[in-house]
Structure formats: C-alpha cells, structure tokens
Amino acid sequence: MSDTSESGAGLTRFQAEASEKDSSSMMQTLLTVTQNVEVPETPKASKALEVSEDVKVSKASGVSKATEVSKTPEAREAPATQASSTTQLTDTQVLAAENKSLAADTKKQNADPQAVTMPATETKKVSHVADTKVNTKAQETEAAPSQAPADEPEPESAAAQSQENQDTRPKVKAKKARKVKHLDGEEDGSSDQSQASGTTGGRRVSKALMASMARRASRGPIAFWARRASRTRLAAWARRALLSLRSPKARRGKARRRAAKLQSSQEPEAPPPRDVALLQGRANDLVKYLLAKDQTKIPIKRSDMLKDIIKEYTDVYPEIIERAGYSLEKVFGIQLKEIDKNDHLYILLSTLEPTDAGILGTTKDSPKLGLLMVLLSIIFMNGNRSSEAVIWEVLRKLGLRPGIHHSLFGDVKKLITDEFVKQKYLDYARVPNSNPPEYEFFWGLRSYYETSKMKVLKFACKVQKKDPKEWAAQYREAMEADLKAAAEAAAEAKARAEIRARMGIGLGSENAAGPCNWDEADIGPWAKARIQAGAEAKAKAQESGSASTGASTSTNNSASASASTSGGFSAGASLTATLTFGLFAGLGGAGASTSGSSGACGFSYK
C-alpha cells in the first residue's frame, strides 16, 4: 500500500511539474520515460522476437520471479542500472524503429497484414502488459522509488500508443481491400477502404493536405456531405472533387465547341467576289497571245502565259485560261489542249473538219507537213519506232540527203531532228548502249492529238492502194487507240463542262469586257485565216442537209483559193499530195523486186 501511495504522490508531482514546464521539457521527459522502460540489448530487427521471449520467461518464472525481486532490492536496482547504461544506445534505435515501422506500412501491401512490424513503444507495451498479466505484484515491485518519476507518465504514453494503434488498423484494412480488388476486381470495397485509410494513390495524406482538400471540398457540391463525414472520408471526397473539377455537362459543352471548331475549319471558305470584267479582259489578251505564239507550232508553256499575260493574277489563273479556251472555241473553232501534264505544255487544235492527213497548216508549211506524214507512216508501220538509218534510207530514195539543201525543205536533217522535235511532232532519242551512237525516231506528243494512227494507216494504204484491214496488226492497234482516245475525250469534255459551269463561263459573262474586234488585233494572218475558215465551216454546216456532189466540188475549190487548208488536199496542199504520191511512186519503182519483198519502211513494194 505504501508503494501505491508513493506512486500516486509521484504522479501528482509529475503532473504539477508538466503544467509548469514548456513543450520542449515535456518531450524530454517522454524520451526519458521511454529510455527507462526495459529495452533489450539485441539489435532492433529482433525486438518482436524478444517480446515473445519476455512473455515466455514471465510465464515460466511465475510468482517465484516476482518474489525474488521483492526480496532482494539489489535485483531491483540492477535492471535500472542496466537500462540507464544503455539509454544512449537504445534511444536512437527506438526512434529509427518508429520511423521505419511507419515507412514499412506503405511498402508491404501484398504481405500478410498480421506480420506488420509494430513500433518499439508497442513492443514495450506488450512486454509490460504480459508481465502484468503474469504477476501484478512483480510489476509493482519493479517500480522502485528511484524510478517513480520515470514510471509516472505511463498513462500518457499508453494513450499515445492506443492512438497509434487506431491509426494503424484502418491502414491494414485498406491493404486487405486493395488485395481483394486485385484478385476479384471489386471497386466499391477498395474505394471505401482507401477513403477510410486517407491515402491518395498509394501515399499517406498529410494532415495539412487533408485540411486543404477539405477546404476546397467545402466550397464544392459535396459541402453538405463533407460536414457530416469523418476526416478520412472527407479527404477521399476532396480527392475525388479535385480529380473531377468539371462536371459532365461542362465536358460535353467543351466537346461540342471543339467539334464545331473542327467542322468550321474543314469547311471551305467562301471565295471573295470576283471582277468578271477584269478576268474576261485578261482572257481576251491571252487569246491574242496564244494565236501569235502558235504560229511557230512550238507548244506554249504555262509559265510563259503567267509571266507575259496573267502576271499579278496568278491566284485566279485557272479561270483566265479556261475563259481564253472558251473564246478560242466559240470564235476561232480552236481548242486549247494541254498535252503534257508535267511540264504544262499547251497546243491549239482545230475543231473544224479535219483533212485527210489530220494536220492543218498554212500553205507555206504544207510541204513540210506532207514530209511529216511520210515519217509518221514509216514509224508506225515499223512498230512505233524507227532507226535513223531506216529513215534516211527511205528519204534517199525520195531524193533527200543529209547535208544537201532542198528547195522546199531546206536542210532536211535539221528539219527532222530539230524543228519537228521542238514542235513535238517527233521524238529523237539515242539508242542505249550503242557504240558508235545510234538514234531512233518516235511519235511526239503533238502527233497523237493532231492526227491518229488510223488516219496515218489510211494515208499509207491510200498510197499503196490497199485496204487498211490487210495490215491486220496495225489496223487492230489503230482501232484500240481510237477507242481509248474517244473515251478520254468524253471524260475530258464532261470535266471541262463542270468546271465552266462552276466558274460561270458560257452564261454571258464572256461579254462582260465588251466586244472584241479580232480583225484589228495583231494576231497574225494565220489566225485571221482561221476566223474566215470558221465562218465558212459554220455556213457549210448549215447547208450540209442539201449538199450534193457538185456542191462538195465547189466547196473544195473555194477552200483551195483561201489561205486555209481545211477540207481535203487543197491547192495549197496539192504540192504536198503530188510530192507524197510521187515519192511513194518512185519508192515503189526503186524498191520493186520479183519476189515482192517488203522495203525498209515496212511497205510491200510491188
């Protein structure tokens, strides 16, 4: 009883001193109490095992151990001395064990919850409680008068330990719930336990962070429920509020605005208003330019049109070119044709009645075009290519030799290797890997549009006085080429009509720039002759219903008197016809043989 009264007096005295001291002295006292409690001398990793050993020893010794301690005061002083000697060594170990136990709680999620390492204070409490259960008298005996100040704050340390146990238990439950979620895929249990544990993404939430999140949640839509919830659930709700700051309605509104912006960016902007009169005036200038440039029969480059005529209106050059093409068709009967999509080369083609050869030109150029038809026939009949040696073999039989000036053709070699090549009537290329170098002739791009293989075949058969079907391979190839060209022409005409309808061409806008007097324009005699030929062609088309053989003869005579060469071999083209037929007649006589063998150009000379 005396011991009990002394311990009560010591407790009263400790409380009086604690009220007078500041917080630092109280913490020092708590550290002293922790140091005076029995601490094993073994390393801190084996503290849990030592607790169980203390329990076993206390159970085995029983009352006898307590009796010995009560009888011998020296035995009471020995543990106190030992504890005081090891105070400096165990103080750091106890603090480190407490810190490591808190850090280990978050790392061991998949481990057994029962195997969580307890803090050092809890170990001491277990040993103290075990000794109390075995023998309460032994516990009272160990409380010596000298240790009374150290044992007096024991109730406060017990309260702190119980608080730590309460903080630890929900965390263990949260680990169990996360394990169940991993195995069974249950979301409700894990979310509730994570809310109870006060963790965010596997990390412990500090009190300051929870307070901040709670303040934010109090201003949000969950403020009513936040006032009725615990601190841990409040932290979880605050975390949810932070993760979803925008409501679903706000997100849907933002998605709609983004979709509307994307749709508006994809929609083509309305073109600015156009000055049709200005565009048509520039198109009329381009028509004059094209007629003047085509006199040389060299294809016209689009870059030249942009540089010389269109100039600053490069953003609307497709409409200017299309308007110029429409004016050429309606006024002159000429089609503006792009023959090379890569280099953007344009030529002018006649839409009037074609000649037998299919190539139109002035009277001065008619002999040259007659020679060109001979060359195209040789190339086509020899498989769409012919070597330069074969070409000159045929021309020598016609009296034409390289290096010798001719009265009609001038320098023949320059004509067929330079002028016809520049005009895109022929292609002149070197034979690969030839030594000494050899060259071949092919049809040029212009020849495919101004004439056709069927026309060339008929021209050759007319010279030979044969039916085109006798040349079976060439006739089949010519038929396939005509079908392909007709399909391409139909598709191109449809596309051109759609483009012109979209641009408003052909609806009277071509008169926006006012009437244009083409007779006074400096477009050259050939263009003026084309205007006259176009007028005659329209008149002939109107009289075609009542035309007869005599009318056809008079039409040919009138056409031969004009500068145009439309409507068969006219007087201007009679020289070409005479030259061509004379050449083939001489070639037939020179190349004739008793066996009826074929000549160099593939014709059978009989």
From Swiss-Prot:
The modification Phosphothreonine is found at T72. InterPro entries: MAGE, MAGE_WH1, MAGE_WH2, MHD_dom. It is linked to Bartter syndrome 5, antenatal, transient: An X-linked recessive form of Bartter syndrome, a disorder characterized by impaired salt reabsorption in the thick ascending loop of Henle with pronounced salt wasting, hypokalemic metabolic alkalosis, and varying degrees of hypercalciuria. BARTS5 is an antenatal form beginning in utero with marked fetal polyuria that leads to polyhydramnios and premature delivery. It is characterized by severe but transient symptoms that can resolve with age. This is Melanoma-associated antigen D2. Widely expressed. In the developing and adult kidney, expressed in the thick ascending limb of the loop of Henle and the distal convoluted tubules outside the loop. Residues 1-204, 248-275, 534-563 are annotated as: Disordered. Residues 171-181, 248-260 have a biased composition (Basic residues). Residues 24-37, 81-93 have a biased composition (Polar residues). Changing K458Q: In a breast cancer sample; somatic mutation. It comes from Homo sapiens (Human). The modification N-acetylserine is found at S2. Residues 142-164 have a biased composition (Low complexity).
